[in-house]
Design a protein with these regions (language model features):
Chain A
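Ferredoxin-reductase
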Residues: 2-79
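Structural signal for conserved beta-strand scaffold positions within catalytic alpha/beta enzyme cores
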Residues: 12, 54, 151-153, 205, ...
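Short, Lys/Arg- and Gly-enriched loop/turn segments at beta-strand edges
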Residues: 46-53, 90-97, 101, 231
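FNR/FR-type flavoprotein reductase catalytic core
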Residues: 69-212
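Local cysteine-cluster metal-coordination motifs and their immediate loop/turn environment
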Residues: 186, 208-235
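Short Fe-S-cluster ligation motifs
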Residues: 224, 228-233, 237-263
Length: 263, 311
């Protein structure tokens, strides 16, 4: 793991659409687990955590959607520009047979690298992905090639009309899946936890909180109820860990450390 | 002591008993009750909150905390959700653990230090630590308050009055004409303890790839093992000058560091950056290290070695 700041050139950029791009870097660490994240520093702007969307043949991919000042500035990054990279940080997903991958929006990103790992192990898994519109669901081609994949959009522009959470029940029942992986908007994650707990299924979920140091000392990403540092013991938590946390779906903290209501 | 007796690492501090002389230093894992509870459970005798001000502060953009070869560089910029939030966390922690809680406060003016301390006193922490020495925030004259005898005297007097019955420790910096004279000023102004030292510098790092400073704030306070000898000398100098108890902090990472601080006269030993190097285990490791060392040297109580380096 590289905690210290070092910049690396972008070796390639792929434009999914003008507001979502993948940036490719030389693989800086031997072992990068799906669900782990890197802190990316855009010199002169800020530094933010991003999970890995893929590691393949010595190249690692980070996929970013323009949602705020930092990610909008990132859309101007070109091949050859240098980006500061620290990591990989945190704990990733562990490998399980017969799983369902449930992803929403940009939460789909870490599941893509997870899917590659499950596939390489020859494990059986199914996938359900949701987004507001077709544009908000990345990597549909890869997922569909690798596993039975259900797509859901809120406007019906791709797959079923509605929400991911309306379809989980049926898929689990039909395919006898025993493990759930999930990442996405927290409202969705809370529903996934309820569904999994109701069925007595184990799960691993990648959560998101405002992070600063990435190395477990600043305390910014500690979640209530547990003292769990999401940058260190997370961002992927298993059922036992996630159930200790009392703030899911209710509050999160901003950069000053203020508690804000979850949208 | 009799051979079969286990040495006692508990200490008495301002008429309160602590299970260990180790304290979580301000700025590390000190934002919420659950975070600090975890540190107390890991073996700290007390925890210090992150520094809080009357009004919430956003702090500096990131990168704001970076490891380098000899320690950490930080310019978090005193981000905090305001003293009222801190009080809620302290109240919550008091119901969950009986470890001591030190509330760290700061202000932009001496008067703001006073109102922050008055507000913090409402949650009845065991100590109010006054951060007059953060290198990232300056007085209106462009220097940290901790560099000026007059500012420290003024702030100590105001805070002591505002804190009522809650004891007050002033956190000092080595970046002043004389840290022992500064401690004397604190003592004469009514402080109950001093904390020494704050981060050193500020310092900086440049990324040679983009040829720019890496901290968003460009410069930041230096902590970690690199500053241990500076902190130790400051503690030794202060305890040779004033009778106030000293909370020693600055690069303490090992049992040997903690022993050196106590031998230099420290009442308590704070740990911050070492959480990065040794994880939360650092507290139980040093507690055990102290116990083992005392057993070997047939020492029953830390009081027996406190200040020995002065003799």
């Amino acid at each position: 793991m590289s905690d210290k700041m070092k910049t690396y050139p972008v070796v390639d950029v792929k434009t999914h659409h003008p507001e979502m791009k993948s940036y490719y870097f030389r693989q800086i660490e031997e072992q990068i687990l799906p669900g782990q994240f890197f802190n990316l520093w855009l010199p002169g702007v800020d530094e933010k955590p991003f999970s890995v969307s893929d590691v393949y043949q010595g190249i690692m991919e980070i996929t970013i959607k323009a949602v705020g000042p930092f990610t909008r500035a990132f859309m101007n990054v070109k091949r050859g520009d240098r980006i500061g990279i620290r990591g990989p940080f945190g704990r990733g997903f562990t490998m399980h047979q017969h799983s369902l991958l449930i992803g929403g929006g940009m939460g789909i990103v870490p599941l893509r690298y997870l899917a590659r790992n499950l596939r390489e192990k020859g494990f059986h898994f199914e996938v359900i992905l949701g987004g507001r519109t077709e544009k908000d669901i990345p990597f549909t081609t890869e997922f569909s090639e690798w596993a039975p994949t259900t797509l859901v959009t809120e406007d019906g522009s791709l797959g079923y009309l509605g929400l991911v959470t309306q379809h989980i029940h049926e898929i689990i029942g039909r395919s006898k899946l025993s493990h759930i992986y999930s990442s996405g908007p927290e409202g969705m994650l809370v529903r996934v936890m309820e569904e999994a707990s109701g069925r007595g299924l184990d799960y691993e979920i990648s959560f998101e909180r405002y992070m600063k140091c990435g190395i477990g000392i600043c305390g910014q990403c500690v979640v209530d109820g547990s003292g769990i540092r999401l940058c260190k013991e997370g961002p992927v938590l298993n059922r036992e860990e996630a159930e200790k946390v009392t703030e899911w779906g209710m509050v999160h903290r901003d950069g000053a450390g203020r508690r804000e209501r979850e949208d | 002591m009799s051979l079969c007796m286990k040495p006692d690492i508990s200490v008495s501090f301002l008429n309160k008993t602590m299970s260990s002389p180790l304290v979580l230093a301000s700025g590390v894992l000190g934002l919420t009750a659950d975070s600090m509870k975890r540190v107390l459970e890991a073996g700290a005798g007390a925890v210090t909150t992150k520094s809080f001000s009357m009004d919430p502060r956003k702090g500096h953009p990131c990168p704001s905390i970076l490891p380098y070869d000899g320690g950490l560089l930080n310019a978090v910029g005193l981000s905090n959700p305001g003293v009222a939030e801190m009080n809620k966390e302290i109240r919550k922690l008091q119901t969950q653990h009986n470890g001591l809680i030190f509330a760290s406060v700061f202000g932009r003016t001496p008067e703001e230090f006073g109102s922050a301390a008055a507000s913090a006193a409402e949650s009845e922490p065991d100590l109010i630590e006054v951060n007059v020495s953060c290198p990232n925030v300056e007085s209106e004259f462009g220097t940290p308050f901790g560099a000026s005898f007059r500012d420290v005297e003024k702030i100590t007097t105001i805070v002591k009055k505002a804190a009522g019955s809650i004891p007050v420790s002033i956190k000092l910096t080595i970046h002043c004409p004389s840290i022992s004279k500064m401690a004397r000023v604190c003592e004469e102004s009514g402080a109950d303890a001093v904390t020494a030292i704050n981060t050193v510098g500020p310092g900086m790092l440049v990324d040679t790839g983009v040829m720019k400073p890496v901290l968003a704030n460009k410069v930041g306070g230096v902590s970690g093992p690199a500053i241990f000898p500076l902190a130790l000398k400051a503690v030794w100098e202060i305890t040779g000058t004033v009778r106030l108890p000293v909370i020693a902090t600055g690069g303490v990472t090992t049992t040997d560091h903690a022993l050196q601080m106590i031998m230099a006269g420290a009442a308590l030993v704070s740990i911050g950056s070492a959480v990065y190097y040794e994880e939360l285990d650092v507290f139980s490791k040093i507690n055990k290290g102290l116990t083992d060392w005392m057993t070997e040297r047939k020492i029953g109580n830390l009081q027996e070695i406190r200040g020995k380096a002065h003799e």
